[in-house]
């Protein structure tokens, strides 16, 4: 702001100011007071004043007449005084702001203790330039803008309000005046932009207006309004893109970088909003509404040319970058806690608030510490550079009100220029310093350096969230042909987008099945190779799903510039329902020359830390990896198949022992310190259990499997025999399938099959193992394990102290599913050494996780970790051996390794070696005349029959089935996997299920039915059915599979969508491959 000598000239040397002269003219011009009103006017004024004071006493009288206590009167008085205090404060602020804007030059000179003539002409502010010419234009335009606002509110807004609610049919604007005080542009700053097609402007906007807007609802005699308002903030204006045609600028974007300050002076019924409590609540709600469309990252876009390209990206552009903020520590903080009425000075319980724009993070509280160590990491999106700031505020946690300890601010532009900043920053408004490491992560449009980023992130001990490797921006545009609600009503669609446990929602679009959203959503990705984007299109009630989409983010890694811009077909929706989205992924990359992080395991200056005072021994170096003993990871899994028994002793007697009955046998197993038990088979001397148990065993010699058979009785169970099997033979041979003669009884034998499953450090065979387990799974057994997890917990460091000074007595709890292992307790130390191992059976490695809690005796949880096992599947040798950061303070050194459970007699080796030549027959181990085990058969047929046929799908769709015969159990097994491309009759999608009959019987004994799937043409069932039949009886039957749908809610009629009939004599039941079968109409005679 430059001032010329003419502008700095003082006022005319007159004893009176122009304002005084004009006042005198209004009062009569001579300084003599005007003639007073008559006696009647004076009496009326006195009566009015008396009436107002009398009116104040009316609430007091009413409270006394109603029998209310004096507390209600005092409460009302307190509310009134609070309202008056807020009201007077707003009016004073409004008057001061108006006075400042009316006489800015004089007040500025007085503040500098100079007269107008003494203010030098060379005083200027090079960053911000005055724009008085713009203010003069606004002054001239302001009355016409007021006329436009009056027409807009009266002709557009008022009718909309009256139509929205029947109670507001008498709503009107009784007064609309923008006043004489227009918006002022205090200064303009033009930023040099790195892009040639963009101009950045910052406008310092100040509005201290005397506007008055009054509304009235005549039906309820309700009046309300606004009389005066203040708004101050920095408005950024972006002119982009610059084009070669008029008007040169393609669009204008406007937004506030920070939330502006707002102060409203209410009138009428809205005076109630000035009551303390309501005042802050109403101001916050209004500011939230403004921020929802005009505060970064939201912006107002005004296109200036038609058919502008990339409007969605202009409205929500890609971030400029990501800043990874490492909040490490603070030192020299002031003490705020006092004891014994301030006589004893304590410490503080500090925590930090980190803000960048609207993104806010809160650290954990460190109790009683003036030099806290947080060691926390946050990732923030930077939308605009320059302009945004990193702000850190430190507080002392108190039960009532937290005490302020200091703050620091830093422009994000400095981080962009430096790449990495690692400094101690002084706290303003307090004492002490805060230690921050700030890293600028660039956004790369290709996946070339993704592996390098993932490898680096694995070494970062980040809390409370793991470090991100990429960012995903989803531009949700529109949808087409969504299904209608019941009664052919238009839905109110909205969209839920989820990546792992982070879910964001779009706004709802009302009464349309072709909604347009035009919204942007941003997600941080830890590993885009394994994560998915889940999209659910729902009605605004969230109860009705209109469509769904699951998109593996690995698809973007192979797309051009990591971008997909296309229509996506919705599942569980209409046949033509689709969603248009633009997905943009960017890899977060830190320059390799700066990849050095103090919080990396092993990278801290542990060796440079001096030992305790008085010690002459150097501190031992911190280990990088664990050192487990030689027995760790050598466990195997023993799978025990308890099949059947024969010729058991009859123990039941009736009529005092005169009538001999049978027995109710069950089997009890004891092995490796565990006790297992089958179910009871009622009244059978030749029972079939067909149950499977799994036990983790070691190779220690001398172990035995104790088997006992009992008859279940009401009082005491009767003994039916026992047998002991040495585990050394089974562990060496890997397989045992024998009839065991029971000992200590006259008769009886038990059929037992034992398998040793050796864990393998490769995930190549996992999918095959999971599918084989699903096929050999019995109904009476728990789900079979697919992997073995071995954990070695060595030590922990830097655990939090009790009450800030006393070390805890920590122990750890390892949990997977419902299985837990508790370590020993190490007394009074923040660096315990456990050196303990534990093993867990894993049934679904993709879905399960390892939970670790470090607890202290009497102090609760000190820290925790949740490690998804899916991360191990991506590691070489399926193993992680490093330091892991706890969610609280501290770290643990741990080795976690996974082994896939593959039977040595399952035929996997034969397939893996012969897969290169499909013509080669798999090698059969052992005696060629010996019947192959069912597991071998299953594995062999999976390798050749699992892929679906590529033939054309029939007009009624297809059903996927697996049919095979289990020779050992003498059961026919059928698995209904799924259907695809089913027929749709009418506008509503079917609710399909599958009904299975074993012809020629049509009774309930052979009928099976799957669960029902809602509103889909591609249902997934994966349900298994069994029939106890001999092989010869099975070959004389046909399997009738019908896909049906409920025709309506009130009707019991079932609509046939298609069927297929399989002659079991024409199928190779030993192969049992999963195959797709064409559905036919009931009138057709064909097969599949």
Curated annotation (Swiss-Prot):
Residues modified as Phosphotyrosine: 993
Residue ranges crossing the lipid bilayer per the database entry: 31-51, 55-75
Domain of life the protein comes from: Eukaryota
Chain residues that bind Ca(2+) 2: 337, 349, 396, 398
Keyword Transcription regulation: no
BP GO annotations: endoplasmic reticulum-plasma membrane tethering; intermembrane lipid transfer
Modified residues (Phosphoserine): 316, 809, 933, 947
Record text on subunit structure and interactions: Interacts with ESYT2 and ESYT3. Interacts with ADGRD1; inhibiting the G-protein-coupled receptor activity of ADGRD1. Interaction with ADGRD1 is abolished when cytosolic calcium increases, relieving ADGRD1 G-protein-coupled receptor activity. Interacts (phosphorylated form) with SLC2A4.
Name of the featured protein: Extended synaptotagmin-1
Organism encoding this protein: Rattus norvegicus
Protein's gene: Esyt1
